[in-house]
């Protein structure tokens, strides 16, 4: 398994993308998480869309001095294009609340809750959202054998883009005693549900639609599959019976609204083979905006082009008092 590294960045890099416009948008991306590369790809498209829509845009590759840089440029709005730690986990929203700068996407509670797979699972179950059975394993437990019956999924507590996720099948040459806990001292071990991978895009509390992921190469929807062209096929809209499709959208809206999310989000489900039972996997409060990303694709199918999507997200910008 490839390990995606985090790295500390002292100084934020600033680049003026457009010096004229109706409002000044600080596009914050990059940063110090393992999802840095995806964030930068998302920001490239978002930056072009903001310029096309007529905004003054300053790109900030976030470092430890982000507060100083924001104070210097004094933006009207921050477009939070960070993925992973420091941005998607509620850190940047918390800072912007203190600075009283409006920002896109969810606030501190929704962001931090969604990013932590253990606490978000508790939230889902409390709100009667169906999920696969799971347990938490700590490095100190010194587990030497499979913690549950195969097949099962290993998930880090706090990573996105399927970073660190592994699926252990019956035939795999895998010894849990050798697992090195690359993304923290605790992991979730989840029962593997064989079924159809479904994704729902939500904008401002309403589900836009759903698509199905058909794997073409890898065994599950991992980081490589998500961001490499030709590794998966997207079926939009998801070819489902009407009752299941409607339930999928309704459950997604329930998750989004009970968590008090804001702007755009993406919710992942598995539709189990044989039973047609829906299992929620997670909600992503900072969905990707890359050329292969799901939310822009679903939005486009429903008549919202990329520039309009970015403007709709921008309209929701606010800070929490």
UniProtKB/Swiss-Prot annotation:
It is an enzyme of class 6 (ligase). Disulfide bonds: none annotated. Its cofactor is Mg(2+); Mn(2+). It catalyses: 2 D-alanine + ATP = D-alanyl-D-alanine + ADP + phosphate + H(+). SUPFAM superfamilies: Glutathione synthetase ATP-binding domain-like, PreATP-grasp domain. One of its GO terms (cellular component) is cytoplasm. ATP binds at residues 148-199. GO terms for biological process: cell wall organization; peptidoglycan biosynthetic process; regulation of cell shape. The keyword Ribonucleoprotein does not apply. Residues 121-315 form the ATP-grasp domain. Its main location: cytoplasm. Pathway: Cell wall biogenesis; peptidoglycan biosynthesis. It is found in: Cytoplasm. Binds 2 magnesium or manganese ions per subunit. One of its GO terms (molecular function) is D-alanine-D-alanine ligase activity. Mg(2+) 2 binds at residues 282, 284. InterPro entries: ATP-grasp, ATP_grasp_subdomain_1, D-Ala_lig_Van_CS, D_ala_D_ala, Dala_Dala_lig_C, Dala_Dala_lig_N, PreATP-grasp_dom_sf. Its EC number is 6.3.2.4. PANTHER family: D-ALANINE--D-ALANINE LIGASE, D-ALANINE--D-ALANINE LIGASE B. Cell wall formation. NCBIfam families: D_ala_D_alaTIGR (TIGR01205), PRK01372.1 (NF002378). This is D-alanine--D-alanine ligase. It comes from Rickettsia bellii (strain RML369-C).
